[in-house]
Amino acid sequence: MTRALILVAICLMLTLNNAAETKVHIVYLGEKQHDDPDSVTESHHQMLWSILGSKEAAHDSMTPWLLSFRSQTNQFPSESTLRFYELQTTRTWDYLQHTSKHPKNILNQTNMGDQLIIGVVDSVTLNWFGFILLKQEYGQSLNHSVTMVLDQYQNVGKEVQLGHAENPEYISPRDFDGHGTHVAATAAGSFVPDTNYLGLGRGTARGGAPRARIAMYKACWHLVTGATTCSAADLVKAIDEAIHDGVDVLSISNGFSVPLFPEVDTQDGVAVGAFHAVAKGIPVVCAGGNAGPSSQTISNTAPWIITVAATTQDRSFPTFITLGNNVTVVGQALYQGPDIDFTELVYPEDSGASNETFYGVCEDLAKNPAHIIEEKIVLCFTKSTSYSTMIQAASDVVKLDGYGVIVARNPGHQLSPCFGFPCLAVDYELGTDILFYIRSTRSPVAKIQPTRTLVGLPVATKVATFSSRGPNSISPAILKPDIAAPGVNILAATSPNDTFYDKGFAMKSGTSMSAPVVAGIVALLKSVHPHWSPAAIRSAIVTTAWRTDPSGEPIFADGSNRKLADPFDYGGGVVNSEKAANPGLVYDMGVKDYILYLCSVGYTDSSITGLVSKKTVCANPKPSVLDLNLPSITIPNLAKEVTITRTVTNVGPVGSVYKPVIEAPMGVNVTVTPSTLVFNAYTRKLSFKVRVLTNHIVNTGYYFGSLTWTDSVHNVVIPVSVRTQIMQRYYDEN
């Protein structure tokens, strides 16, 4: 078959309304009609000439912003204003039991990913020729490199929309802020012994597939404001190049906040690009976003994407605070300076004995008189969820000649090193204990010890506060996130420009960090099972995930109120690479299933045709979105009894026999027929029906359960989430 070509013209349209405004449009022109590039360009000019009215206007509107997309699609003409995305920012693999200690485990089966190619769309990496030069300058500290097969950059969309503003970014594939380097090293970094960050977290750093190759596509750019942005056009182009280059897996650690765009809209460049990648058999792993813990904040929600939440791991950085009454409080920090011996401890507050005003809120410490802070350890409280609050509080105390700061805040946020200054985090409970001690004595004092590294018990696993949560705001019947992985204080390589750079490494937190963990594992699964579809691989990791942490304890979800985690926090659970390699059954899907999904949720025939490059006419009546063959069941509006169909494919022993185990959501009846699935050499696929009936008589929130198919060896678990809605489309706030 002749490879088709999407021709995407990035056109400059000037809207004359007092001032000229530059806009960017992605125009899909369908299959290429000419092999000669000059003929192709001339056909674009002819089209624009007919629209704009003159040959000169057509030429000016397109030059030089022309991108040729090479993936096999056949789009109807459409256009959309450019959308920008945000980047979603050593112990991990041991915690996940993803090691090479057993001779038959997935790392050894795949030779640690040798010959695999993981495509990373990000800010690229410190490698290739730029890496060689930097290594000469900075020595061996950059050894946590990845094996690069190519790197490219796309910045047409960014340049057109934002212009070539003065900023420190490299207009080349070289990484500026370290985000892409960190992501690539997490997915496929080589073994680097005796790695640490400020002396903490010491061990051997490596990626999930340490011998895999990385193909980097730079579509994200550091701006003069300090932010990093990724244009939709650059993302689509980068994904298209990755498809053309033949990557095995794509890892994309960016997204945007609600409200989300429809999956068929080119403004959702990730969803559109990912669809074409998945159609070519390339799994796409995406960060779920950092807008948690609020519900309905999950991004990258298309059902063909593997969407990843972030958890902590069984490692912490305890820092001991000893009060003058010999009570020791254990905070968290990244402090590796000297001991701070017993020093005056203060909480700035009005006592009524002074005409001065004092401020105990962390954001207002700089407003305090200098003598209140000078040569003291300061306690403050904040409601902020940003790690930058700790940095700012430390900076303010330093300027006022203080000796340290203890920040009381909601738990679950990223730690900051505060550049060698002792800044410690405690929760409100411990902060209140310290405050009561201060108020109980005329001469409160405290001493601070350097941070230690604690690994294993009793450190528990939690879904990170920042990790975006479901349910899915576009299609509530599609469970998102799909899976969770460690994404808090992940130690990996970075750029020297990284604010938190330390000898080539940094600790970063975000779903940006958890997504490449899963991407590395997905690459290995594709090596073990090269004929599995992206949907089968997604099913394998969802149905075999840990729903307790590796020590067997329940997983909690951090937030304003810590609670037991549910599928909207972590999808199927925490990824388990060994079990995913041998799941027993998979819930498989292909492009036809995704087209049925698009029809079921009400997209028009023309918009679906534009996405899938194939004329599509949806059936009437529409199929049910509940029947999409996902490894989950999510019913957002149950009022009457519904029956749902799923199909499983046996990828285990030929003669397997499975029976269901049902854990029904509270107040909901769930039955499965047939009650046994019997596979043989001629029957690899079997369907079953799930009947769901609510006993509730009022609108409820979601209740959770599970459906497990078991053959006594494999336990194939899918989450079940049900919300009763007697009154449909009802916003419940009473």
Swiss-Prot record:
**EC number(s) recorded for this UniProt protein:** 3.4.21.-
State the signal peptide span. Answer: 1-19
**Which residues act catalytically here?**
122, 179, 512
Gene3D superfamilies in alphabetical order:
2.60.40.2310, 3.50.30.30, Peptidase S8 propeptide/proteinase inhibitor I9, Peptidase S8/S53 domain
How is this protein annotated for GO cellular component?
extracellular region
Prosegment location in residue numbers:
20-88
Sites carrying a glycan are: 108, 143, 326, 355, 497, 669
| Major location (coarse) | secreted
User: Where can this protein be found?
Assistant: Secreted
* Family, as annotated: Belongs to the peptidase S8 family.
Against PANTHER family, the record matches this protein to: PROPROTEIN CONVERTASE SUBTILISIN/KEXIN (PTHR10795)
Q: What is this protein called?
A: Subtilisin-like protease SBT3.2
Species of the source: Arabidopsis thaliana (Mouse-ear cress)
Its gene name is SBT3.2
